[in-house]
């Protein structure tokens, strides 16, 4: 049925909504590697840590913590406590926003790339009180500029 791998950057609350063809550890690992390849050495600064829920699709967490070839540490993986969605509240909130656009139970594999990008952009462009009425996108682009990352077309390359 496919699914979305969703990640949220902690400082700016920039949201990643990455389609995966199956809810599997292999798919999650492959998509994290694509993100790492896209951001290069800046990956470790953007994703200092990742908090997953306890689904089996995150069973390759040790592999995710390391760069694929060098096995150098690239991030730290944490797990939320079972049945404590508050451990990942920002992510869960954004996951709820997806439901405005896609009904629960919809096969993600039937949703085209442009629709996914559009939904993701709408979530990231939403002004938020917690961010001083700025959007996640505005703040994230500022952070990328500090890291000298000028290309933010990741969603077009997934």
Residue ranges of predicted features:
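RNase H-like two-metal-ion nuclease catalytic core shared by retroviral integrases
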Residues: 52-54, 61, 68, 76-102, ...
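Active-site beta-loop-alpha junctions of metal-dependent nucleic acid enzymes
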Residues: 17-42
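Short conserved beta-strand segments at catalytic cores or DNA/RNA-binding microdomains
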Residues: 1-16, 21, 32
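Short helix-terminating capping/connector loops at secondary-structure junctions
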Residues: 42-46, 72-74
